Amino acid sequence: MLILQAFIQSPGETFLNLGYITIRWYGLLISVSVLIGLFVSKKLAKARNINPEYISEILPSLIISSIIGARAYYVIFEWRLYSGENFFTSFELFNNIIQIPSFLAVWEGGIAIHGGLIGGLISIIYFCKSKKINLKTFIDILIPSIILGQSIGRWGNFFNNEAFGVPTNLPWKLFIPIQNRPLEFINYEFFHPTFLYESLWNLLIFIVLIITFNKQNKKDFFRPGFISCLYLISYSFGRFWIEGLRTDPLCIGGLPPFCDGGIRMAQFISIFLFSSGLIGIFFLRLRTYIGKNRKNG
């Protein structure tokens, strides 16, 4: 019963307070994701005869570019939350309170995975060109770690009491404190745990990608780039439907919680990425077909 209670109600965003420094769950989960991702990607790189140390080399720039991209994407579409009187926020450093621009306070939440993917992709392209590595193969190596990191990172939303869905009375409903509820749902206590839905969906994708990766050498169907396309299709499919439940969408031409008169940005991007994945697989299969005909001819 205690486990169930802890599951449906966040214990708070703070993992440990050491006085001079506060360790938050969000930061801890990101750190764990990076370490696990480093281990997984090195294993996959070795399986593709690519120097595993390349993973360690790209890691710093990949983290920085992904965080910058994820934060910038979110701030651009939610600038109203960081402008005017909200431009500065308080930050405690060695028992001293200082004022910093609120858009720099990443630890308070407010990042978007699609922006992180854009930032990370820029870093990967530059790295592959400088090292003369096959881009599609290298991305295929990194993708399973990325989706696993997304699965783990979603629990940061749980501890921050954010990114939840519309009200519900389902047995797995999530309690949200009144100060974290949208004004439209201020009188509701329980909401869809959309963080959990996406975390489990992403974990399932990770398993499928690893199975596919291990079969890539055995079947000609799975050419370099197939893992990346499969990720785009599967993640975008799940994100599209889960996004429809959320009360904090980034909107184009509308305002949360329903983007009335506009469109949810994440759903728009999901449609684009889903289509890109399908087109990518089509061209991969086309290249395989043409290659076989040339050999037979």
From Swiss-Prot:
The chain crosses the membrane at residues 20-40, 57-77, 105-125, 133-153, 193-213, 225-245, 266-286. Catalyzes the transfer of the diacylglyceryl group from phosphatidylglycerol to the sulfhydryl group of the N-terminal cysteine of a prolipoprotein, the first step in the formation of mature lipoproteins. InterPro entries: Lgt. A 1,2-diacyl-sn-glycero-3-phospho-(1'-sn-glycerol) binds at R154. It is found in: Cell inner membrane. It is a multi-pass membrane protein. Belongs to the Lgt family. GO terms for cellular component: plasma membrane. GO terms for biological process: lipoprotein biosynthetic process. The keyword Transferase applies. It is an enzyme of class 2 (transferase). Its EC number is 2.5.1.145. Pathway: Protein modification; lipoprotein biosynthesis (diacylglyceryl transfer). GO terms for molecular function: phosphatidylglycerol-prolipoprotein diacylglyceryl transferase activity. Keywords: Cell inner membrane, Cell membrane, Membrane, Transferase, Transmembrane, Transmembrane helix. This is Phosphatidylglycerol--prolipoprotein diacylglyceryl transferase.
